[in-house]
């Protein structure tokens, strides 16, 4: 018998459903009318999930979600613009790195890795520096599982007349987001996250007005979001070879998303997964890194055992042998590891993961208390 695939307790790639995987068993012609209809239907549904309405358009891009982040920043921020980056983790820092590489003026507003970005502090930073034109916010900082207060920060940006670009990579589909009336210029996510597709396609749900004003602004050809948008409007096609199988899988994943009950049901399942995980891990002696008020139900960071017998590589391997894949820590201030709560999983799989982690502790002689 073939070996069973391990259960991925990661923030993407994820464990996917059989229906999603089966959707990739068919080949598509990239210029064929049927594939063009597939692209159109997926983009329309992504705008629908985001609550965007006619003022927004979805522009898909080949590659990981970070490709789409760089495309949005390089296309939507004018050359004389300046970006404020609230920074409480590795993915916020990545935005700052992209801006440096693009030569876009920016400033960082630092927060601790366990501290949600403060709308009041952002408001004060905007008041201090009138040169700032944009705020680039990570909605859910995946390095810790930290949720930043999107609605409060969007309200500040609206009041100050600043454009807001949101990296919603690990929140879109799981947490409520309503673009209409929000003042958000762009929301960025990817196929292989909370929509439970496979990796390979990022997308930007952008407000039409600033996108249409951005012709010729991007320093890149392949990451020119305006050019991708304009070409798709003219031809219904992608500029370059599209990830056909990824898109077909995402179509199947979206069908399942709506059948489940959309974002409220998806978010409720992930919350149940998170509760089962945290309760079980606490029973083993683990403590989450974040306070419960800042914790999103997508991925949980746990403090590593203090026992000298603990080494992440051996711990990971022991849990992997039991059929579960963990995620390493990404914090600078604490020794941690991460466990994802998303994918085609339920509380049963989370309890199985806890049992596997307990077995690994016993096998490796790691004491928790």
UniProtKB/Swiss-Prot annotation:
Kindly list the cysteine pairs connected by disulfide bridges.
Answer: none
GO MF assignments: 2-aminoethylphosphonate-pyruvate transaminase activity
Q: Biological process (GO) annotations?
A: organic phosphonate catabolic process
Q: InterPro entries, from UniProt?
A: Aminotrans_V_dom (IPR000192), NH2EtPonate_pyrv_transaminase (IPR012703), PyrdxlP-dep_Trfase (IPR015424), PyrdxlP-dep_Trfase_major (IPR015421), PyrdxlP-dep_Trfase_small (IPR015422), SP_NH2Trfase/AEP_transaminase (IPR024169)
Q: Does the keyword Lipid metabolism apply?
A: no
Q: Which reaction does it catalyse?
A: (2-aminoethyl)phosphonate + pyruvate = phosphonoacetaldehyde + L-alanine
Q: Name the UniProt key words of this record, in alphabetical order.
A: Aminotransferase, Pyridoxal phosphate, Pyruvate, Transferase
Cofactor(s) needed by this chain: pyridoxal 5'-phosphate
Q: Which residues carry this modification: N6-(pyridoxal phosphate)lysine?
A: 193
Any one Pfam family match given in the protein's UniProt record, by short name: Aminotran_5
Q: What class of enzyme is it?
A: transferase
Q: Does the keyword Oxidoreductase apply?
A: no
The text of the family note is: Belongs to the class-V pyridoxal-phosphate-dependent aminotransferase family. PhnW subfamily.
Assembly and binders: Homodimer.
> What does this protein do, in the record's words?
Involved in phosphonate degradation.
Q: What is this protein called?
A: 2-aminoethylphosphonate--pyruvate transaminase
